[in-house]
Amino acid sequence: EPDYVKALAELCAEKDWLLLADEVQTGVGRTGSLFAFQQYGILPDAVSFAKGIAGGLPMSGILANEKCRNVLGPGTHATTFGANPVCAAAGLVVQETLSDAFLEEIKAKGAYLREGIESLALPCFDRTRGLGLMIGIEVKDGFTNKDIANRLIENGLLVLTAGPGMRLLPPLVITKEEMDQGLEIMRKVLA
């Protein structure tokens, strides 16, 4: 929720606490911007990112400002996602792909998918939320997200459960036809 994120950033600034953004899932275009924090108008002291930076190959990174750049000295941090030449090459391709137009497409695809889900008016879904192609679906009381997810998966639509709700994390290159196919599976299985 935008108000929560902004209030947290203000509290960290007021108390002189470090604000760290974990963008492992949300970063590198998933939400329609390079990093999700950019859509909230805040600037964290450090940002961690992985997964999308090399198209799913093992690579990660941390960006930090002056305030916390000396917190981790040489040899105090190791990673299994430190990359290699193949992952670095994939990372370069990802960086070349992340144009403003590509990020705008992700925002538009996310809006299309959320509007499509809401227009189905399914009895088990309350509302959708999210940024870009990171979509959450709130499940109404009386329905079980695991049962809904299993039914969708059995019919060819991969969804994730998250708490009492569900998450959709389609590939950033998903087409309108593929989104329509997923919406049709939802309609057929859950209406």
Predicted region positions:
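Conserved N-terminal phosphate-binding loop of PLP-dependent enzymes in the Aspartate aminotransferase
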Residues: 1-191
